[in-house]
């Protein structure tokens, strides 16, 4: 007999990204919707059977999605804005894709829903829009269909839902500054969830998992009452036939645990990775309701390192001192880790044994559950426990003394750039001689099949390095020529040689490991393959200098060097767990600093250091923002560029994030120019820029590159005027909101032509 095991969620893209490939083929018209549905059904069955074979008791269903689970929840509740309903698609999947990607075709022209980061992960969710026209009602059978689908295979699953509290807190009203949680809205949402719970009870469901990750955030006035009022209406629908697990993750719920414990949930899921100390203290202080099971989230759903069984067992034992009702669970959905280490033969066995991807985490979960109920003698005799402990005894990788020496020699002066920004801006305007409202792009240009094929040929040894370089130079030449023709002011080389903005740098730094197939979903069908920080990081040789110098030699325009910043490299990698994030970021900062100075020596006058993921790992509770993150993340960025000349213009770029609350910290990065991804956020960041007297020049994105639609010149011109209402014209740059790598040339160049034309039109009007 072992403790009950529960998986919060499982990756849905497939071991070989089957879901991504079939959906993208459908978007291109190369397959049918029936084929998409068939592939999805095969994947669901495979994933359920894998979990069943691993001995998992509570296997999730309804964790699958074609695009995003928040989007699925919006559709479940009929939270579908009128602009999408008017498209009148025959198939619900088409409506879902239009909401996620936008639509431009014979049925109309609509933008996508806003997209934001899912808490502190690199996953993105679609933001539901609730307005006066929204008619909340049960609108989908997806959760029930997938439960029945698994049941037909002989597997009784645990349906998973995003909870009503989290859904409402993440939704927005596009017609108002804030969503009003009025009684009518709250009752309508609660009624749908109660109806869902009742239907599950009729179907013979034993457990329902309702995810409420928003509970781990700071509470605003009224939040606790909102939560209580929702569940006061939902929980009675159980009627004693079905159990409800309230699942929380990405932090602790110590401030509301007492309330949650008294509401009568059958299970409470606690994250014992990120919220370990606070959650344990709350359980010890307030106890556990008699009929409630605590689901101990001990298997990390956010990183790829092996679980330390001794630590996990200690956490389970601590809970057992309070209650006998303890289940063992993943700390969060396994959506955020790759599928399996199987097939990663590029990693040596003595390296690979330190990693656990989703499939391996199933085995870890089962083994921890068995050991949790074992006697002391059985634990001592356990080969699994001994083998696991051996992974953590001794030193995994030797430290690099040169890296340690360099960090120890840093002084306060290394983190401060001279002269002050206002003086630098004067010198840069004179040196660069750019027009008002200068136009540029964020860095990458579309990577065609031919570009990807050429990289693959080099990797397989089918072409020489010289042949590869010649091909890439031709790509750069064509990209530069096209940028010159449409009239962009600051050019880029296109980044054709880069597979990924993080992996590319990792491949050229000491201390990283790489996988063949460790893909994770970022948004929609977009997947990323993060590198692994294995040891101390340093730069062996220049990385980008040759390409940037070549590009500058091919044009009289200003050429922008393109780098990825240290915080983003760490946040979009699998970080080490044996040293702190601060230590790893400082190592990365010194490596990128060397590259910045070499670019400057090579004649590159504008250098962009992307910190796309800076906001991503900001702690969810404000009291932790500075002491646990910003106090070392911001100085790390300054360390990268502090030694350049005053005339060298330092740019940075930030992706899907909410910046308003840390705008002063962003200004403190001391960059000369920053581009924000802002087009899907309705430019709300402009108010923060205005109110904070933001000193950095800025380019809020004027169109959304994550949608295939082409913005008109007038649309972009209107956007520019919106920006100018809040910003000094001399501090405004005009750019798309992100890199163009994942777009096609067919939409990229017309969009940029409209961008340049709009900027010129505004300049002309301002000159009158």
Swiss-Prot record:
CDD domains found in the cross-reference section: CIMS_C_terminal_like, CIMS_N_terminal_like
Residues bound to L-methionine are 442-444, 495, 610
Concerning Gene3D superfamilies, the annotation shows:
3.20.20.210
Catalytic residues as annotated in Swiss-Prot or TrEMBL: 706
Binding residue positions for 5-methyltetrahydropteroyltri-L-glutamate: 17-20, 117, 526-527, 572, 616
SUPFAM superfamilies in UniProt: UROD/MetE-like
Question: Which keywords are on file for this protein?
Answer: Amino-acid biosynthesis, Metal-binding, Methionine biosynthesis, Methyltransferase, Repeat, Transferase, Zinc
Q: Give me the comment on cofactor binding.
A: Binds 1 zinc ion per subunit.
A GO biological-process term:
methionine biosynthetic process
Q: Pathway it belongs to?
A: Amino-acid biosynthesis; L-methionine biosynthesis via de novo pathway; L-methionine from L-homocysteine (MetE route): step 1/1
Residues reported in the UniProt entry to bind L-homocysteine: 442-444, 495, 610
**Highest taxon of source:** Bacteria
MF terms from GO for this chain are: 5-methyltetrahydropteroyltriglutamate-homocysteine S-methyltransferase activity; zinc ion binding
The protein's role, per its UniProt record? Catalyzes the transfer of a methyl group from 5-methyltetrahydrofolate to homocysteine resulting in methionine formation.
Protein name as catalogued: 5-methyltetrahydropteroyltriglutamate--homocysteine methyltransferase
What organism is listed for this UniProt entry?
Answer: Bifidobacterium adolescentis (strain ATCC 15703 / DSM 20083 / NCTC 11814 / E194a)
Which lineage ranks, top first, belong to the organism behind this chain?
Bacteria, Bacillati, Actinomycetota, Actinomycetes, Bifidobacteriales
């Amino acid at each position: 007999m072992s403790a009950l095991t529960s998986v919060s969620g499982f990756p849905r893209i497939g071991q070989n990204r089957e879901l991504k490939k079939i959906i993208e083929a459908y978007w291109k018209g190369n397959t049918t919707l029936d084929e998409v549905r068939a592939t999805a059904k095969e994947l669901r069955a495979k994933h359920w059977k894998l979990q069943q074979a691993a001995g998992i008791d509570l296997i999730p269903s309804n964790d699958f999605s074609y695009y995003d689970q928040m989007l699925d929840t919006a559709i479940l509740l009929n939270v579908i804005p009128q602009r999408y309903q008017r498209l009148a698609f025959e198939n619900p999947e088409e409506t879902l894709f239009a909401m996620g990607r936008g639509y431009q075709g014979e049925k109309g022209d609509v933008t996508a829903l806003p997209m934001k980061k899912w808490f502190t992960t690199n996953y993105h969710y679609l933001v539901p829009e609730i307005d006066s026209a929204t008619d909340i009602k049960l609108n989908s059978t997806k959760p029930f269909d997938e439960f029945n689908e698994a049941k037909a295979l002989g597997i009784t699953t645990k349906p998973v839902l995003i909870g009503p509290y989290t859904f409402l807190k993440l939704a927005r009203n596009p017609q108002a500054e804030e969503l009003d949680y009025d009684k009518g809205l709250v009752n309508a949402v609660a009624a749908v969830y109660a109806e869902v719970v009742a239907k599950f009870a009729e179907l013979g469901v034993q457990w329902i998992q309702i995810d409420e990750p928003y509970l781990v955030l700071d509470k605003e006035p009224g939040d606790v009452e909102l939560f209580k009022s929702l569940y006061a209406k939902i929980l009675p629908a159980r009627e004693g036939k079905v159990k409800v697990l309230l699942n929380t993750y990405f932090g602790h719920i110590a401030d509301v645990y007492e309330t949650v414990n008294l509401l009568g949930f059958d299970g409470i899921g606690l994250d014992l990775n990120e919220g370990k100390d606070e959650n344990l203290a709350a359980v010890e202080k307030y106890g556990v309701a008699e009929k409630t099971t605590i689901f101990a989230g001990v298997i990390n759903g956010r990183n790829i390192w092996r679980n330390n069984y001794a630590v996990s067992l200690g956490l389970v034992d601590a809970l057992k001192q309070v209650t006998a009702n303890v289940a063992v669970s993943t700390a969060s959905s396994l959506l955020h880790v790759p599928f399996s280490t199987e097939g990663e033969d590029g990693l040596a066995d003595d390296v690979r044994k330190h990693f656990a991807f989703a499939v391996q985490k199933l085995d870890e979960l089962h083994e921890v559950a068995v050991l949790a109920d074992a006697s002391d003698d059985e634990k001592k005799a356990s080969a699994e426990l001994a083998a696991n402990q051996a992974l953590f005894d001794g030193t995994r990788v030797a430290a690099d003394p040169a890296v340690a020496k360099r960090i120890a020699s840093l002084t306060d002066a290394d983190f401060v750039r001279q002269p002050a920004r206002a003086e630098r801006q004067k010198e840069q305007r004179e040196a660069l001689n750019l027009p008002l409202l200068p136009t540029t792009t964020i860095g990458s240009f579309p990577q065609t099949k031919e570009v990807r094929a050429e990289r693959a040929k080099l990797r397989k040894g089918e072409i020489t390095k010289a042949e590869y370089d010649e091909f890439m130079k031709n790509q750069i030449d064509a990209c530069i020529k096209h940028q010159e023709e449409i009239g962009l002011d600051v050019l880029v080389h296109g980044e054709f040689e880069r597979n990924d903005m993080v992996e590319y740098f990792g491949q050229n730094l000491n201390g990283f490991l790489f996988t063949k197939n460790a893909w994770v979903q970022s948004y929609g069908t977009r997947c990323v393959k993060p590198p692994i920080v294995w040891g101390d990081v340093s730069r062996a040789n220049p990385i980008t200098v040759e390409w940037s110098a070549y590009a500058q030699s091919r044009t009289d325009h200003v050429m922008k060097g393109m780098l990825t910043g240290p915080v983003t490299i760490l946040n979009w990698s699998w970080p080490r767990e044996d040293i702190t994030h601060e230590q790893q970021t400082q190592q990365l900062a010194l490596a990128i600093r060397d590259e910045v100075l070499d670019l400057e020596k090579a004649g590159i006058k504008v250098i962009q250091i992307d910190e796309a993921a800076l906001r991503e790992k900001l702690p969810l509770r404000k009291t932790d923002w500075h002491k646990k993150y910003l106090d070392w993340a911001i100085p790390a960025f300054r360390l990268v560029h502090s030694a350049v000349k005053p005339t060298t213009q330092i740019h940075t770029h930030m992706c899907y994030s909410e910046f308003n609350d840390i705008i002063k910290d962003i200004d403190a990065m001391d960059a000369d120019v920053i581009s924000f991804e802002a087009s899907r956020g309705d430019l709300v960041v402009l108010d923060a820029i205005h109110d904070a007297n933001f000193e950095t020049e800025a380019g809020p994105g004027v169109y959304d590159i994550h949608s295939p639609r082409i913005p008109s010149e007038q649309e972009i011109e209107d956007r520019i005027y919106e920006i100018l209402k809040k910003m000094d014209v001399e501090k405004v740059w005009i750019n798309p909101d992100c890199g163009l790598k994942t777009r096609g040339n067919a939409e990229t160049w017309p969009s940029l032509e409209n961008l340049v034309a709009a900027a010129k039109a505004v300049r002309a009007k301002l000159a009158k």
